[in-house]
Amino acid sequence: LAGFFPHLEALKKEREFVLCGDINIAHQQIDLKNWRSNQKNSGFLPEERAWMTRLLHAGTEGAGLVDVYRKLQPDTTDSAYTWWSNRGQAYANNVGWRLDYHLATPAIAALARTEEIYKTIKFSDHAPITVDYDFTL
């Protein structure tokens, strides 16, 4: 994972960008339903969370990206989940994790206006997240 940072730094020197998709890491305790019991599980391991923190940290040690969903919804928990295990009744009981992200350079993140985690139709164990940005192409 550490090898990804030089690529992001080079990209930031060229242009603004959005990195979005399934990162497979729940960054903070509010990003999953049962954080206490998942501290030793992949997706919430300390080293994974540290990598994510570094991804969001500005300065020489980090990539300085912005978690756009958290910018728009800083305290949201249960409605923020984008993944549910296929075991048990995880989806029905909303025992989920927030593993999917829109990460953006600060200039683009500042243009984010609204977000939506689409749960109307279940396509897979993940729900897509969309963000509306205030700019035209």
Regions found by a protein language model. Give the residues of each.
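Metal-dependent phosphoesterases centered on the DNase I-like endonuclease/exonuclease/phosphatase
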Residues: 1-99
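A residue-level signal for conserved active-site and pocket-lining positions in enzyme catalytic cores
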Residues: 22, 68, 103, 126, ...
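Short acidic, gly/pro-rich beta-turn/loop elements at beta-sheet edges
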Residues: 31, 113, 125
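Hydrophobic/anchoring residues in structured secondary elements
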Residues: 70, 114-117
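Pocket-edge structural micro-motifs
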Residues: 85, 101, 105-106, 119
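Active-site beta-strand termini and strand-to-loop segments that position acidic
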Residues: 94, 105-106, 131-136
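Short helix-loop capping/hinge motifs at secondary-structure junctions, enriched
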Residues: 108-111
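Surface polyanion/phosphate-binding segment centered on an Asp-His-Pro turn
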Residues: 116-137
